[in-house]
Amino acid sequence: MHRIVAVPRHATAIRAVADLLSRFRLDFIFVGSVARAAHLGDPVAAGSIDAVATMGPQQKSQLAMMAQNNGFGVDREELDAAEELDLVPITFDGIRVNVLIASNALYGRMVADAESVEFEEIALRVPRAEDFALLLQMNNDVEALMSVVESPRFDRAGYNRKLQAIGLRELVVPE
């Protein structure tokens, strides 16, 4: 696992998201570019900051209100449009932030099993390699997926069991 490195603007956004979700007392993980930085060593330099948080649907509006009171931008129309998606779309200093609600067992387990990784003076949580590989698979990011799968830390048998359990047997990785 690599120490997370980010350009200053994104580093500020990552810290703000971690602070917001921690203050709201949510279990959460960073996915997307932050997880990519942890697993592959790529710096966070562009794009959105994405997190998955364990919370009830009724907490979405509370999170949006708290975000707005802590320097985040909240577009009410966009928030209303995302109602069915279990997503809280916000911004911080012009950077898009997506907080996905862990509304099913797969995401809930991903949050519960997350690993800790260093970022500046704080510890962030990101999905385990096998869960990150599943996210890469769903994003069709074959190059990054192969890098993760070929890592000595990767549990192919565990990954394959998870794929079979969720009905994706055709994506099993040869052992």
Residue ranges and their predicted role:
Residues 1-175:
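Compositionally biased terminal segments of proteins
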